């Protein structure tokens, strides 16, 4: 059914590759190949970043919580972690992906990936441990260890911060690259 109640039939199902080729045709009406290729590189990179850093680890934790009997498929919004998980995908994640697809930096970053990051680290991961703790102390410990292990991955190193040597090297590289600017914050 369509929005107006009239039943419609899809004439042809196309693949994502066919849809992208069709969209490229529209893009090339105004933009050259470099512009279009760079856009898709940035867009695809954001989707991969979202998927690999947030969506896949979150889905794995949700699947494991379900397997351990902490979550029930019959009660999809029983625990806080289920709400936050849904919002990571549907609300913040969708805004980031749609913002990137429409070249909207404010929606891509502030209303998208910033919110995804904030809720993943500050709400979702603690809610994983809290949900497990409701089931048993053993599961709380198991999921605290899983979260701790996740936070040791390279993409999450920022949480720990830089060593003094790493900070000095970063500051030196920054000054070498931007030495024409003498701001007080460097």
Task: Enumerate the predicted regions with their spans.
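Primarily the internal scaffold of c-type cytochrome electron-transfer domains
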Residues: 1-186
